[in-house]
Swiss-Prot record:
One cellular component (GO) term of this entry: cytosol
The reaction(s) this protein catalyses: sn-glycerol 3-phosphate + NAD(+) = dihydroxyacetone phosphate + NADH + H(+); sn-glycerol 3-phosphate + NADP(+) = dihydroxyacetone phosphate + NADPH + H(+)
SUPFAM superfamilies recorded: 6-phosphogluconate dehydrogenase C-terminal domain-like, NAD(P)-binding Rossmann-fold domains
Broad class of where this protein is predominantly found: cytoplasm
Molecular-function annotations in GO: glycerol-3-phosphate dehydrogenase [NAD(P)+] activity; NAD binding
Organism: Citrobacter koseri (strain ATCC BAA-895 / CDC 4225-83 / SGSC4696)
Name this protein carries in UniProt: Glycerol-3-phosphate dehydrogenase [NAD(P)+]
Membrane-spanning segments: none
Binding site for NADPH: S15, Y16, H36, K110, A143, R259, V283, E285
Gene3D superfamilies: N-(1-d-carboxylethyl)-l-norvaline Dehydrogenase, domain 2, NAD(P)-binding Rossmann-like Domain
Chain's gene name: gpsA
Function per UniProt: Catalyzes the reduction of the glycolytic intermediate dihydroxyacetone phosphate (DHAP) to sn-glycerol 3-phosphate (G3P), the key precursor for phospholipid synthesis.
Length: 339
């Protein structure tokens, strides 16, 4: 592989970052995958697969592993960041002085900035400046299915039309991976954060034993909360009927591959928050996202009762069943109400 002519450098060698790197390489592109732990990267190189997360998917020959950040960033102008949302800003500040002058950045991170609840576009602008083209990809994607080449579709939004076109061409594969462009940069980002929260609620509902009717009602009203918050932030409401909204919401709320859903199920069954997190064994993005989405909703004066009750369970010690009964006991109202 040419050391400075890769199609994409992927920052983050977890399950999703690895799956996206494999997908790009399988599309015939030269790809560099960087991980922060040199020992982990050495293991990936030795095994030519991610044994911990994707043991049955060998790396294509065009996928190169790299533990030196400067070398990885010099390899391509296109940088795909796939790290947890709570370290997103830190990672961008780390890569800023090492990026090429012509660099363009896209992220697959879902969530908001820890503590502040800011959109990741604002974090990126603060860290990288106003000139670099930015993009985000989001949608219903479990890493194992994506890496296995099973049919998957996502949304792509960018601040730069040329970058959006280039990314769509790089990622799109007619056999298995559809990439839909969407001009709504805010909406595509927001959907991925809110769905994590609602997925915890769906898991709680199933853990309590409420059944399919309750789960479906929660998903539907969760979509209403997502759309309500999006409208307050200036997003296009139709975005939330697409891959980054409804698509990701349904997937995460209904399939046990979702860590957020499994986490919620444990809470619904009576397990405490810390024990449930420990049992999952990986980052549960929805735990932090709940606090961040609630903060954002308060800032913009948006009522989000499901999010509020999930927050009460996660951070205030409220019982999951009690939270569900609080929601069921709310006053009657028009389904189309903004409250």
């Amino acid at each position: 592989m040419n050391q400075s002519n890769a199609s994409m450098t992927v920052i983050g060698a977890g399950s999703y970052g690895t799956a996206l790197a494999i997908t790009l390489a399988r599309n015939g592109h030269q790809v560099v995958l960087w991980g922060h732990d040199p020992k982990h990267v050495a293991t990936l190189e030795r095994d030519r697969c991610n044994v911990a997360f994707l043991p049955d998917v060998p790396f294509p020959d065009t996928l190169r592993l790299e533990s030196d950040l400067a070398t990885a960033l010099a390899a391509s102008r296109n940088i795909l960041v796939v790290v947890p949302s709570h370290v997103f800003g830190e990672v961008l500040r780390q890569i800023k002085p090492l990026m090429r002058p012509d660099a363009r950045l896209v992220w697959a991170t879902k969530g908001l900035e820890a503590e502040t609840g800011r959109l990741l576009q604002d974090v990126a602008r603060e860290a990288l400046g106003d000139d670099i083209p930015l993009a985000v990809i989001s949608g219903p994607t479990f890493a194992k299915e994506l890496a296995a080449g099973l049919p998957t579709a996502i949304s792509l939004a960018s601040t730069d039309e040329t970058f959006a076109d280039d990314l769509q061409e790089l990622l799109h594969c007619g056999k298995s991976f559809r990439v839909y462009s969407n001009p709504d940069f805010i909406g595509v980002q927001l959907g991925g954060a809110v769905k994590n929260v609602i997925a915890i609620g769906a898991g709680m509902s199933d853990g309590i034993g409420f059944g399919a009717n309750a789960r479906t009602a929660l998903i539907t009203r969760g979509l209403t909360e997502m759309s309500r918050l999006g409208a307050a932030l200036g997003a296009d409401p139709t975005t939330f009927m697409g891959m980054a909204g409804l698509g990701d919401l349904v997937l995460t709320c209904t399939d046990n591959q979702s860590r957020n859903r499994r986490f919620g199920m444990m809470l619904g069954q009576g397990m405490d928050v810390q024990s449930a997190q420990d049992k999952i064994g990986q980052v549960v993005e929805g735990y932090r996202n709940t606090k961040e989405v609630r903060e954002l909703a308060h800032r913009f004066g948006v009522e989000m009762p499901i999010t509020e009750e999930i927050y009460q369970v996660l951070y205030c010690g409220k019982n999951a069943r009690e939270a569900a009964l609080t929601l069921l006991g709310r006053a009657r109202k028009d389904e189309r109400s903004r409250h």
